[in-house]
């Protein structure tokens, strides 16, 4: 009787984890999709709208400035979140344990901030918000491969099939642009494609690294640590280096941004959606793993298209829709597993050995 009761309790536990993991992943998709609207609108405000299209170095520096201000906004929203939950002390304790815990969040911030978020802003600028939203669809594949090779997260045949479909969707998005079928009026459109690749690789790597960190820390606290490091990297390393070693007016861009109320409004909205999108992402990853969270999170692209179309009244090109349909289909294939399949996310023996070696 006790064995039967234990088995039933475990099934309920697995089902609850899967259900809440699914719910958090859906919220991640909704908020991520919404982020592309204010993230794109910011480029139509002073000082960014005044930057000439051919001033590549200045535009990239402006992207770095807005990414830093955005990271500060996300940090403030997360501070409010953790303050409400009473986890500020946990945040402090986690930050000071750099060797064992917070070093992983520092690495995640490098993957997610200077690489992924910066790359996504580049894609919005040089290739448009629709391309930026859909090009990141490959990030679950990147995250799943890293998680499988690093700490042996299990990949079922169904998950592998889903990833293959997502890859086809990504090829459908990139193909026309790579072969010259995307008629862009910007000579620097390749920077948009590079930004899309950066966002996919960066967010995929961040998902795997964050999953490693959440083995020994709380997701709410972890995401606060991650953005703390991003604020540090941009504000104390990258932007000061640009200020001292180039003649680009970094300080003027920052002052003009902070002095423009409408620019701050868009940053405020973008930071609020991204803060709780990231919170949902980390919570879902801790419950259902890197691959499944990324698979369901890919719904953000469909939602981004809806949000962008509502605000711009413009529909995307046909090949974007093909890539979107394939990627969304692959996402549902990846998630369509039983609750018991999610019960053991990793090959525990070899996974623990890999983590020990990483220490």
What are these regions (language model features)?
Residues 1-68, 183-212, 350-359:
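Glycine-/small-residue-enriched transmembrane alpha-helix faces in small-molecule transporters
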Residues 2-7, 158-177, 298, 307, ...:
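Hydrophobic transmembrane alpha-helices of multi-pass small-molecule transport proteins
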Residues 19, 23, 27-30, 56-84, ...:
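Hydrophobic alpha-helical transmembrane segments of multi-pass integral membrane proteins
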Residues 27, 113-117, 129-138, 166, ...:
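Helix-helix packing/entry segments at the starts of transmembrane helices
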Residues 31-34, 91-130, 172, 270-288:
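Specific transmembrane alpha-helical segments of multi-pass solute transporters/efflux pumps
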Residues 42, 66, 123, 149-155, ...:
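Hydrophobic/aromatic residues within transmembrane alpha-helices
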Residues 43-58, 175-188, 243-259, 314-316:
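Membrane-interface helix termini and inter-helical loops of multi-pass transporters
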Residues 55, 140-164, 302-321:
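C-terminal transmembrane-helix exit sites in multi-pass transporters
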């Amino acid at each position: 009787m006790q064995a039967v009761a234990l088995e039933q309790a475990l099934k309920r536990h697995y089902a609850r984890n899967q259900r809440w993991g699914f719910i958090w992943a859906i919220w991640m998709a909704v908020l991520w999709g919404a982020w592309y609207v204010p993230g794109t609108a910011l480029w139509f405000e002073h000082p960014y709208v005044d930057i000439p299209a051919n001033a590549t170095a200045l535009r990239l520096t402006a992207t770095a400035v807005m990414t830093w201000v955005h990271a500060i906004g996300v940090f403030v929203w997360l501070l409010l979140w953790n303050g409400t939950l009473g986890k500020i002390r946990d945040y402090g304790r986690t930050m000071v344990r750099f060797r064992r815990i917070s070093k992983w969040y520092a690495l995640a911030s490098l993957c997610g901030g200077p690489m992924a978020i910066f790359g996504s802003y580049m894609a919005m600028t040089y290739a448009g918000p629709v391309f930026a939203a859909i090009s990141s669809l490959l990030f679950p594949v990147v995250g799943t491969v890293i998680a499988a090779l690093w700490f042996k997260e299990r990949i079922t045949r169904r998950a592998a099939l889903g990833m293959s479909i997502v890859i086809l969707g990504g090829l459908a998005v990139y193909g026309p642009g790579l072969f010259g079928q995307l008629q862009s009026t910007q000579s620097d459109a390749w920077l948009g494609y590079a930004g899309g690749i950066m966002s996919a690789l960066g967010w995929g790597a961040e998902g795997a690294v964050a999953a490693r960190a959440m083995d020994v820390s709380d997701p709410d606290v972890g995401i606060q640590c991650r953005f703390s490091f991003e604020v540090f990297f941009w504000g104390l390393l990258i932007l000061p280096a640009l200020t001292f070693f180039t003649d680009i007016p970094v300080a003027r861009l920052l002052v003009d941004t902070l002095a423009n109320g409408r620019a701050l409004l868009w940053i405020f909205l973008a930071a609020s959606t991204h803060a709780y999108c990231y919170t949902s992402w980390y919570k879902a990853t801790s419950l259902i793993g890197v691959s499944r969270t990324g698979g369901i999170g890919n719904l953000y692209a469909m939602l981004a298209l809806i949000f962008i179309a509502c605000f711009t009244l413009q529909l995307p090109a046909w090949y974007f829709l093909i890539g979107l349909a394939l990627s969304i289909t692959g996402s549902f294939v990846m998630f369509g597993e039983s609750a018991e399949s999610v019960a053991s996310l990793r090959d525990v023996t070899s996974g623990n050995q890999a983590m020990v070696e990483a220490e």
